[in-house]
Amino acid sequence: MSENAEAPKQPVFALQRIYLKDLSFESPNSPAVFQSEWKPQVNMDLNTENKKVSDNQWEVVLTLTITAKLADKTAFVIEVQQAGVFMIDGLSPQQLAQTLGAFCPNILFPYARETIDMLAVKGSFPALMLQPVNFDAIYAEAVKRQQAQQAAPAEEAKH
């Protein structure tokens, strides 16, 4: 073997920074909402986005929107964009997609959850502890949906 033969590239993953990118708290029906018994309907919407910052740096943004309602009145709406910059190199395209779509959001979620809890309390509402999210399952479902959508036009072309 030649000494000049290139060794296989080792995968690199490093968290470089976690930060709060955007934050919003609204309590449109306060103070009247404080007079009602606290039995809210809580809805959580989440989304992830990523973009390449440099050759081996990626920004991943986890957006959580929490809406708490009492009957038909909105008690509060909290939106948090928790972001991170990750150094990622040496992964296959499939590994990179899963890392950006599942692994990085798993790292960011506890920070977003803590911020949401703190904002609810600062807004004079009871603490709101969000349940863990299985980003691996969400990612796997998104991949499955994408594959089904790609297969559908191929099936139509056959008929």
From Swiss-Prot:
Transmembrane portions of the chain: none
Keyword Protein transport attributed: yes
Keywords of the record: Chaperone, Cytoplasm, Protein transport, Translocation, Transport
A biological process term (GO) from this entry: protein transport
One Pfam family cited in the UniProt record for this chain: SecB
Principal cellular location given in the protein's record: cytoplasm
Subcellular location: Cytoplasm
Chaperone as UniProt keyword: yes
GO cellular component terms, A-Z: cytoplasm
GO molecular function, one term: unfolded protein binding
Organism superkingdom: Bacteria
PANTHER family reported for this sequence: PROTEIN-EXPORT PROTEIN SECB, PTHR36918
NCBIfam families from the UniProt entry: PRK05751.1-4, secB
Free-text function comment from the UniProt entry: One of the proteins required for the normal export of preproteins out of the cell cytoplasm. It is a molecular chaperone that binds to a subset of precursor proteins, maintaining them in a translocation-competent state. It also specifically binds to its receptor SecA.
Subunit structure: Homotetramer, a dimer of dimers. One homotetramer interacts with 1 SecA dimer.
Family: Belongs to the SecB family.
Protein's UniProt name: Protein-export protein SecB
Organism: Hahella chejuensis (strain KCTC 2396)
